[in-house]
Swiss-Prot record:
Its main location: endoplasmic reticulum. It comes from the Eukaryota. It is a multi-pass membrane protein. The gene is hrd1. E3 ubiquitin-protein ligase which accepts ubiquitin specifically from endoplasmic reticulum-associated E2 ligases, and transfers it to substrates promoting their degradation. Mediates the degradation of endoplasmic reticulum proteins (ERQC), also called ER-associated degradation (ERAD). Component of the hrd1 ubiquitin ligase complex, which is part of the ERAD-L and ERAD-M pathways responsible for the rapid degradation of soluble lumenal and membrane proteins with misfolded lumenal domains (ERAD-L), or ER-membrane proteins with misfolded transmembrane domains (ERAD-M). Belongs to the HRD1 family. This is ERAD-associated E3 ubiquitin-protein ligase hrd1. SUPFAM superfamilies: RING/U-box (SSF57850). It is found in: Endoplasmic reticulum membrane.
Amino acid sequence: MKFILYVLASLVLFGLSVLLSLYSSANVYSATVMISQSPVHITIGLNVCLCLFFAIANALKTLLFGSLQTFELELLYEQFWITLTEIMLAITVFREAISISFFMLLSTLMFARVFHSICSFRTERLQIQLTDQRFHIFSRLTCAYFVLSILDASLIYLCFTSEHLGDKSTRMLFVCEFSVLLLNLTIEASKLCIYLYEARHLDQVWDEKSTYLFRLEVCRDGLRLLAYSLLFMYQFPYVSVPIYSIRQMYTCFYSLFRRIREHARFRQATRDMNAMYPTATEEQLTNSDRTCTICREEMFHPDHPPENTDEMEPLPRGLDMTPKRLPCGHILHFHCLRNWLERQQTCPICRRSVIGNQSSPTGIPASPNVRATQIATQVPNPQNTPTTTAVPGITNSSNQGDPQASTFNGVPNANSSGFAAHTQDLSSVIPRRIALRDGWTMLPIPGTRRIPTYSQSTSTTNPSATPTTGDPSNSTYGGPQTFPNSGNNPNFNRGIAGIVPPGWRLVSSNTQSLSTNSAMTSLYQNASSADNNLGSSLPNVVPLSRGLTQSNETSNTFPAASSNISSQLRELHTKIDELRETVSNFRADYNSIRTSLNQLEAASGINERIQTTSADSLLNSNGMSGTEGFENTQTSITTNDNQSSILTSSDQTSPFATDEDRQNSRNVQLETVDENF
């Protein structure tokens, strides 16, 4: 309504200016001369021409497209700034050729771009379902393609033949632009034909549609790049720096490169989808949401179809609705996943890449498999060699083809340690020289050195040899290595470092230890035959019920490390005996002082209160595995009217215990020792 009022006001103002010129002039010729020479009359005339141009364009838009929707207006507004930048560059380059004809061609080019953009929006948005409601839209869109193609061809011919529109360089600019618009219109019409063909064959799925669409887009970008390259070569003799052509060439080249790269990633992600994305089991579907995130339909395993199949609509031919599991653990339909991968090669839920073993993006919560990956990355693969053995810890041996199909304690896709596991995440980090039996896995021991390196020059007869840090090639990463007491037997290294590396422990899903488990003891037969003393050096094995809590257990150490620990324990026991003797002396002195105070108070009859507080306990009886400790003891001596009383309070146990209370084993653990005491 506002635009109509603006057009009417412009026409009325232009009519008044013409009447005023005729009234003040003797004849029509003099009135025409006055209008052409007066700046006010020229401005009013240009305003009327612009209003008429906008009115014609608006009428053509209403005729071809009808009313625009909100999202179309937003997209046009976004493209307006790009078009405005290109116009400014064109005016800067061709500032000498600026004229009324130049502005008319430039305005026509702007509106032609708007119409072509609307056609592109409608084509991409159009769902080719030829019902009675959509047939009118489809016919109007076809008419718009026909009218715009005639308009583009006419303007190209006009710019080629009409010399009064400007010099050759300016006309070639508009020829190139209208040719690119005609090319875009042809590509969009071809895509519309592809959509129409797909709509005519709804009873089957056309998987090759994405390939044809990609070829059309590549042809579009390639021909655009060729057109602007020819324009650059033609304008170079006339324009010193053809900035406009350079920008268009860069845009086309980047679009072509990005499209080819995305298609290559799509081909990589969909090369063998049945092998890359295993079929989700019925148990995994039960433990997760059965609704597909893309189509919002319920997913079913092929072996467990829905019960009410008669009420459901028949699926088109070739439509694969098999639930596929991504590396991140999310499940989607096969067909929905393929359509999604055409646009993005990431999970639609967590945005994790589906190509390769890539980590989660920053700021996005990790999937359950990431926890298992973080644990497994602490174990190096000694030789980084592929293996065909089962993944350690998979509890369901019948699903070796799909390592993710097992569960443990209600956790989907979990190994025996309770963490979710994935073959691609664990195969390159966990040492897999030997296969672990079902119900066993390896967990790291926090706070321990893993995979220590022993020097080549270490004597095999020296039991106190200490581990040294050397070249990784001389460690259990795969290089040669000499261990204490190994002799010349080659099975020693394989028995220790080849099965369970130092700093790790075996964890079982039952309460049976390694020494009584015949299934796991067979793994160490070769190692046990290498050395008679090897049985005492077997890795630390704990049940699963204690595996996650015993983080401070002693790790699998070599004889040299065991010797150092024994010497440290002997020194610790010596210090404990010295502390006990000091405590005994302190107790005797304390008793003598207390007796003297009682005698002094009874003799002198002085009313005073003496309050003494003993020192804090030196050792905590709970932390010393049977060794008593001092508790907070407070003694109050109160004397009132020649009467004294001694109040002694203790938390649990008096520090002055008898010898029987102090009897305990040598298995102690020192947590805190005050050396200044």
